[in-house]
A protein has these predicted regions:
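Low-complexity, repetitive regions of proteins mediating host interaction that are extracellular
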Residues: 15-18, 67-68, 178
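Pan-zinc metallopeptidase signature
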Residues: 105-185
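Short, solvent-exposed secondary-structure capping/transition elements
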Residues: 42, 55-64, 87-96, 138-140
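Post-HExxH zinc-binding segment in Zn-dependent metallohydrolases
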Residues: 65-115
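A generic hydrophobic-helix recognition signal that picks specific residues
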Residues: 40-44, 69
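Active-site recognition of the HExxH zinc-binding catalytic motif
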Residues: 43-60, 76, 80, 84
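Active-site-proximal structural scaffolding
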Residues: 38, 72-76, 120-123
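Auxiliary, metal-adjacent structural segments of Zn-dependent hydrolase domains
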Residues: 1-30, 34-38
């Protein structure tokens, strides 16, 4: 079930104005803020549907973000990437990359993030850099996000990185690299 809500709804009052969509596993309802403009509104529906199908039924946690917050950036970026790819295929369009000032993304001022996404742009920039380092397409991140049992998706990603680290003599551990990619824009 998909339900659109306004600023008087309990979801808005509990979660605030920054939340565009919310998946409630108990009621099996996806809540979407009704004031979102298109195409973002439709994309948020696909985004939340994707979260619903990547949820571990044993613990209601989503994607590779099972044991800690390490996978959150990757999970949200690849979920938005998936949602926008679905939207693009349905409507037969593609989105151009944009340069977005970091102050528009609740980041430190005077930077620029490059992304074609309409949400989670700063995470998408990190995902793009990680894809280049690993030599994988962004669709790889979508595929590992369903490997949530025993953190297999995150382990697979870290293993790929460790292989590349040894091959290219990279100086950083996987977690330090994620931190660097998150803060360098």
């Amino acid at each position: 079930k998909v339900e659109f809500y306004d600023q008087n709804h309990r979801i808005y009052l509990q979660k605030g104005a920054d939340v565009k969509g919310f998946r409630d596993p108990e009621s099996k309802t996806i809540f979407i803020r009704d004031s979102l403009a298109e195409p973002l509104r439709e994309m948020v529906v696909y985004h939340e549907l994707h979260h619903a199908v990547q949820t571990n039924p044993d613990n209601d946690k989503v994607g590779i973000n099972q044991e800690s917050n390490i996978g959150r950036l990757i999970m949200e970026a690849q979920t938005q990437y998936f949602a926008e790819m679905v939207y693009s295929e349905i409507h037969g369009i593609s989105f151009e990359e944009r340069e977005i000032p970091t102050e528009n993304l609740r980041m430190i001022n005077n930077g620029t993030v490059v992304s074609s996404l309409h949400n989670y742009e700063m995470y998408d920039a990190m995902l793009s850099k990680l894809a280049i380092i690993l030599g994988v397409p962004k669709s790889y991140f979508v595929s590992i996000n369903f490997l949530y049992k025993n953190n297999e998706g995150l382990k697979d990603l870290e293993s790929k990185y460790n292989d590349k680290k040894q091959e290219c003599e990279l100086p950083y551990s996987f977690q330090v690299l994620l931190l660097i990619l998150d803060y360098i824009y």
